[in-house]
Amino acid sequence: MCVVYRTSVLILLASGCSGVFDTPEDSKETQIKKSFAKTLDMYPIKNLEDLYDKEGYRDGEFKKGDKGTWVVRSEMIIQPKGKSLTSRGMILYMNRNTRTTTGYFSIEEIDSRKSLDERETEKKYPVKMINNKIIPTEEIKDEKLKKEIENFKFFVQYGSFKGIENYENGDISYNSEAPIYSAKYKLKNDDYNVKELRKRYNIPTEKAPKLLLKGSGDLKGSSVGYKEIEFIFIENKKENIYFSDGLNLIPSD
């Protein structure tokens, strides 16, 4: 995983199962929520191997007979005031054709106080998944880190967006020329997803986050565009705390 700067983090989501889309009178906010709901309605998927049997958005980019590969990704990014930015997360590639999964756990640190050639460091630990269990494929001597990897849970396994249509008064942005779009909503600390994140991560702030839904490409679906979701707790030049998650169906190699 490559977290270079705050604005360059792209966690991808594909538009999932098809259904009735928007009507001409739908607002852009409604269209954005419906576009994301096609994938987010699948949350939670407790057993990730269920994705082998789940369809996603496919277009001409997929070869005939290719069922596609699900890309699952979650990461927590924390930058305390005056310190370096650290990202810890995992990405899996779940091939629906071969029903096999590989990926890696990543720890990345970015320290803008250092010289350019020393500013960024990243360590990747390759993994595979069998019977819904994450298994490191190389020896890890650090037992604490090994357990962190083996017990890692993706947001898609416990998050829920069943009430996304009820989110209101979002900060909406839409550029038809690109096209790019986003919707940002203020959440409370008693929000289900916020509570679940706080259970699993040591989030060093009591501030309630904002939920950001952001994407590019055709709102009705595109395999070349992107969609990302983020829970942004703090975002400024000196301090950043946010969580990113993605679920994307891409053509298999």
UniProtKB/Swiss-Prot annotation:
Q: Where is the protein found, in the record's own terms?
A: Cell membrane
Q: Which domain of life is it from?
A: Bacteria
Q: Where is the lipid attached (S-diacylglycerol cysteine)?
A: C17
Checking PROSITE patterns in the record gives: PROKAR_LIPOPROTEIN
What InterPro entries has UniProt attached to this entry? Answer: Csa, Csa_sf
Asked if the record carries the keyword Signal, the reply is: yes
Q: Identify its protein family.
A: Belongs to the staphylococcal tandem lipoprotein family.
Membrane topology is:
Lipid-anchor
Q: Which GO terms describe its cellular component?
A: plasma membrane
Which region is the signal sequence? Answer: 1-16
Key words of the record: Cell membrane, Lipoprotein, Membrane, Palmitate, Signal
Question: Where are lipid groups covalently attached, annotated N-palmitoyl cysteine?
Answer: C17
> Which organism is this protein's natural source?
Staphylococcus aureus (strain N315)
Give the protein name, as stated in the record. Uncharacterized lipoprotein SA0399
